[in-house]
C-alpha cells in the first residue's frame, strides 16, 4: 500500500470539501472513521462510486439519510470533465479532459476481446523523448489522484451510457498517456490501488500496466509499493542511439535500467516473470537488421516480450516511420532468437490518438531547471 498522507492540501477542493476520488480505500476508511462511521460505510460508498460510477450521495440507497447529509456537507465526488471527444474510424475514442485550466488526453481502444484505456499521469512531460509529441509540449505539473482515477471513472461512465452503445466495458488500463508515471508516484500509485481494489474498479493486476522510460530510483521504489504489469520504453539497442532519442538514458543508461527491471520482476507476480519491451520503429535510426541483432543480444538476460511500434508522426518531427518491409525484417531477426515479438497495430492515428501523438493543452512551459526540481519532489528520491 502507498503511504500518501491525506492532507487538506492534496484532497480538498476549492469549496473546502474533500474529493473522495482522491482517496484509496485505506484513506477512505480513515476519513469515515474521522466522521464517526464504521469502515464498512467507506466500502459501501466506494462501491457506489466505482461499480456504478455514482457521484450523487442521494442515489446511494443503502447509505442512511443522516450519513448522506453529513457527506454532502464535507465531501464530494468530482471527476474531471470531458471537453472534447474525437472518434476514429477504427472505433478508438480520444477524450480531451479538463484538469484545471489545462487539458490531458485519454484514449479508449476497443478490441474484440477487451477494451483498453490509455491514461495520462502528468500535464505534459519532462523527459523530452525526441519522437514523442507530448514531450514537445514541455512539463507543467503532476496530476492528482482524482485527476488520474477520474479519467477511468469518466470513461467508464461514458462507455456505460447509451451514447456509446455497444462499446465494451474497460478491461485494461495502461499508464501510457501523457507524462512519465514514475515521476508522479505519490499520485499514480494510489490511483492504481483504486483500479485494483475490489471496491474500486476491481481490475486484475495483470491488466493494469505502467510504462516507464527509465527513472531507475523510482522503479525500485515502485516495486515496494504495488505490483502491476510493467512495460519499458526502450526504443534503442545501444546507449549511443538511446542517448539521442531518450535523453534520460544519459543519467540512467540501458544497463542500469535493465538491472532495475530485473529487480522489479523478482518482486512482481503481475508480470508472470517477464516485462514488455516497447520499441518505436524510426526509419533508418534504430530499425536496421544490425540493430535487431544488437537488441537480441542486449535482452538475452531479461525475460521479455517485444512490442514493435510503428512511429506515429506529428508536425515538425525529424523522423520518418519505418517501412513495413524494414519492420518485418527486424521482427524476423528477433524471432530467430526466440523472442515473442509483436508488431503493434496502429490505432486512432487519424485523430492523433496513437502512441506518441497525445499532446493535450499545456500552458506556460516550465523551464528545464524547474522541471528537474519537480522530478525530484514528485518521487521523493533525492538522488534523482
Swiss-Prot record:
GO biological process, one term: tRNA methylation
MF terms in GO: 4 iron, 4 sulfur cluster binding; metal ion binding; rRNA (adenine(2503)-C2-)-methyltransferase activity; rRNA binding; tRNA (adenine(37)-C2)-methyltransferase activity; tRNA binding
Sequence ranges assigned to domain Radical SAM core in this UniProt record: 111-350
UniProt: S-adenosyl-L-methionine binding residues: 179-180, 211, 233-235, 312
Database matches in InterPro entries: Aldolase_TIM, Methyltransferase_A, RlmN_N, RNA_MTrfase_RlmN, rRNA_lsu_MTrfase_RlmN/Cfr, rSAM
Function noted in UniProt: Specifically methylates position 2 of adenine 2503 in 23S rRNA and position 2 of adenine 37 in tRNAs. m2A2503 modification seems to play a crucial role in the proofreading step occurring at the peptidyl transferase center and thus would serve to optimize ribosomal fidelity.
Protein name: Dual-specificity RNA methyltransferase RlmN
Amino acid at each position: 500500500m502507498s503511504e500518501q498522507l491525506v492532507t487538506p492540501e492534496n484532497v480538498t477542493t476549492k469549496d473546502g470539501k474533500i474529493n473522495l476520488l482522491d482517496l484509496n480505500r485505506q484513506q477512505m476508511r480513515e476519513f469515515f472513521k474521522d466522521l464517526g462511521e464504521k469502515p464498512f460505510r467507506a466500502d459501501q460508498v466506494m462501491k457506489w462510486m466505482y461499480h456504478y460510477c455514482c457521484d450523487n450521495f442521494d442515489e446511494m440507497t443503502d447509505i442512511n439519510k443522516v450519513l448522506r447529509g453529513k457527506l454532502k456537507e464535507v465531501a464530494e465526488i468530482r471527476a474531471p470533465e470531458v471537453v472534447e471527444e474525437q472518434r476514429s474510424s477504427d472505433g478508438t475514442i480520444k477524450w480531451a479532459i479538463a484538469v484545471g485550466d489545462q487539458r490531458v488526453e485519454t484514449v479508449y481502444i476497443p478490441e474484440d476481446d477487451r477494451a483498453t484505456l490509455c491514461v495520462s499521469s502528468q500535464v505534459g512531460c519532462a523527459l523530452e523523448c525526441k519522437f514523442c509529441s507530448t514531450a514537445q509540449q514541455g512539463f507543467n505539473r503532476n496530476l492528482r489522484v482524482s485527476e488520474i482515477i477520474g479519467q477511468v471513472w469518466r470513461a467508464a461512465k461514458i462507455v456505460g451510457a447509451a451514447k456509446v452503445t455497444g462499446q465494451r466495458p474497460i478491461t485494461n488500463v495502461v499508464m501510457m498517456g501523457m507524462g512519465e508515471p514514475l515521476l508522479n508516484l505519490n499520485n499514480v500509485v494510489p490511483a492504481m490501488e483504486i483500479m485494483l481494489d475490489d471496491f474500486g474498479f476491481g481490475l486484475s493486476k495483470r491488466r493494469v500496466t505502467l510504462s516507464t522510460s527509465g527513472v531507475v530510483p523510482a522503479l525500485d521504489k515502485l516495486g515496494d509499493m504495488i505490483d502491476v504489469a510493467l512495460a519499458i520504453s526502450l526504443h534503442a539497442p545501444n546507449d549511443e542511439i538511446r542517448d539521442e532519442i531518450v535523453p534520460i538514458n544519459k543519467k540512467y543508461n540501458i544497463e542500469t535500467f535493465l538491472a532495475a527491471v530485473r529487480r522489479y520482476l523478482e518482486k512482481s507476480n503481475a508480470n508472470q516473470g517477464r516485462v514488455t519491451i516497447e520499441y518505436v520503429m524510426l526509419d533508418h535510426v534504430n530499425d536496421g537488421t544490425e540493430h535487431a541483432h544488437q537488441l537480441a543480444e542486449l535482452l538475452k538476460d531479461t525475460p521479455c516480450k517485444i512490442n514493435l511500434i510503428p512511429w506515429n508522426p506529428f508536425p515538425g518531427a525529424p523522423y520518418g516511420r519505418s517501412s513495413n518491409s524494414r519492420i518485418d525484417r527486424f521482427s524476423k531477426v528477433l524471432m530467430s532468437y526466440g523472442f515473442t515479438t509483436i508488431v503493434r497495430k496502429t490505432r486512432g492515428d487519424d485523430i492523433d490518438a496513437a502512441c506518441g501523438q497525445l499532446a493535450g493543452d499545456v500552458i506556460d512551459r516550465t523551464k528545464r531547471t524547474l522541471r528537474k526540481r519537480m522530478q525530484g519532489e514528485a518521487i521523493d528520491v533525492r538522488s534523482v
